[in-house]
Amino acid sequence: MNVYVTLKTKLVAELRQIKQTLQTERNIIRVLRRKLKQIAAQKRFIKFLPKLRYLPTPVTKIEQTARFLVKKFVDPKMKYPMDSIYDKKLSRQSKKVAASRKKKWQRLEKYLGGISNMTKIKEKQIANNVAIIIGQQEEMNAVRECQKLGIKMFHIVDTNCNPGLADHFIPANDDARNSIKFILGKFLTRIRLAHKIKVKFKKTSLKK
C-alpha cells in the first residue's frame, strides 16, 4: 500500500512538472510567434517606406504618417504622439479618472480624427474624394454628409439597403468578412494602379 501511495505521489509530481514545462513552452512559443509577426510586419513596412513619397501627403507630415503606419501595422503598443499628449494632460489626475478620460478622448479621435482637418480642405478638393460605404443602414450619417458635400459614394449593397442612395453600388453581402475583404482588395488594386498612372502622367507632363 505504501509503495502504491509513493508511486502515486511521484506520478502526480511528475505530471505537474510536465504541465508546468508545457505551459512555459507555450508561453515561449506565443512570444516567439508575436516577435516573428512583428519582424514580418517591420520587413513589409521597410519595403513600403520608399513609396511614402508617392502618397498625397505634404513633406512636413510624412514623419507623422510613418509613425501612424508603424503603430498600426508594426507595433500597436508603440507610444503615439497623441498618447503622450493625453498622458501629459492627465498626469495630475487619479489613475481611474485618467484612464476613463483617455478612453473617451481616444474614442473621439478614432471616430472624428479623420474629419478634424476637413475644414482646411477646399470645397472642390472635398468633391474630388470618394467614399466607400459598407453597412448602409448603420452609416446613414456618413451617407448624408457625403450627399451634402458632394462626395461620390460606392455602396456595398445588401438586401436591406437602398441602392438609390448610392452613386455606384455593388450587390454583395455586407456582413460576410471574406466578401468585403475581396471587394476592398479589388478597390485597392485599382486605386494603386490609378495612382501610378497619375504619377507617370505628371512626370511625362513635367518633362514636356
Curated annotation (Swiss-Prot):
Subcellular location, principal: plastid
SUPFAM superfamilies per the UniProt record, alphabetical: Ribosomal protein S2 (SSF52313)
UniProt keyword terms in alphabetical order: Chloroplast, Plastid
Any single biological process term in GO: translation
Subcellular location: Plastid, Chloroplast
GO MF annotation list: structural constituent of ribosome
This protein's record includes keyword Plastid: yes
KW Membrane (keyword) present: no
GO cellular component: chloroplast; mitochondrial small ribosomal subunit
PANTHER family: 30S RIBOSOMAL PROTEIN S2 PROKARYOTIC AND ORGANELLAR, SMALL RIBOSOMAL SUBUNIT PROTEIN US2M
Assigned protein family: Belongs to the universal ribosomal protein uS2 family.
Full protein name: Putative ribosomal protein uS2-like
Organism this protein belongs to: Chlamydomonas reinhardtii
Gene name in the database record: rps2-2
